[in-house]
């Protein structure tokens, strides 16, 4: 999967970066977790601070566009984001257990 960042805007009021991007991929549409992981690696931020707000596939093509928010700290993220968005973007239990064991 290749991700091309279209816009990276700093939102100082909410202590976050807002990123608009295009993604191209082969095969099936990647999972939200895969996209978040790739964005976190590209921007050199922890996966837990990346909120994938929108990820829409382009009909008939192996491409998608999306919108993500990267917070500076988890406390601010929990204050700003709605509960369902946090739940949609939380890590699976296996991932959390692995990180705690390291």
Curated annotation (Swiss-Prot):
The keyword Ribonucleoprotein belongs to this UniProt entry's keyword annotation: yes
Keyword Ribonucleoprotein applies: yes
Domain of life according to the entry: Archaea
Cellular-component GO terms for this entry: ribonucleoprotein complex; ribosome
Residue intervals passing through the bilayer: none
GO terms for MF: structural constituent of ribosome
Gene Ontology biological-process entries: translation
Keyword annotations: Ribonucleoprotein, Ribosomal protein
Family in the record: Belongs to the eukaryotic ribosomal protein eS24 family.
Protein name, entry field: Small ribosomal subunit protein eS24
Organism: Methanococcoides burtonii (strain DSM 6242 / NBRC 107633 / OCM 468 / ACE-M)
Lineage of source species: Archaea, Methanobacteriati, Methanobacteriota, Stenosarchaea group, Methanomicrobia
